[in-house]
Amino acid sequence: MVNVPKARRTFCDGKCRKHTNHKVTQYKKGKESKFAQGRRRYDRKQSGFGGQTKPIFRKKAKTTKKIVLRMECTECKHKKQLPIKRCKHFELGGQKKSRGQVIQF
């Protein structure tokens, strides 16, 4: 289990160019646009008769995703992303583990 604090003091690539406090959140994929070129092409190909026209991917190999931290500078609001290792359980701003404590999911 990976537990990451909600705030981190790290270097700001933006206007600051120095170590500042950053607000940490987890990156989430945005909603896909209906008007991207690939989506338009796919929709056009799918319309009409003829069933499924492109292969549906079924051979999933990975059981986890890499966690991406999105850090926002508290001074200049510049945002940067930091990928960390793969993990099954990710927690943002959870309790710190004390000695001899059992992990609860």
Curated annotation (Swiss-Prot):
GO cellular component entries: cytosolic large ribosomal subunit
Keywords: Ribonucleoprotein, Ribosomal protein
Keyword Ribosomal protein: yes
A molecular function GO annotation: structural constituent of ribosome
Region of interest: Disordered: 23-61
GO biological process: translation
Annotated Pfam families: Ribosomal_L44
PROSITE patterns: RIBOSOMAL_L44E
Gene3D superfamilies: 3.10.450.80
Keyword NAD: no
Annotated family: Belongs to the eukaryotic ribosomal protein eL42 family.
PANTHER family assigned: 60S RIBOSOMAL PROTEIN L36A/L44
Name by which UniProt lists this protein: Large ribosomal subunit protein eL42
Record organism: Caenorhabditis elegans
Gene designation: rpl-36A
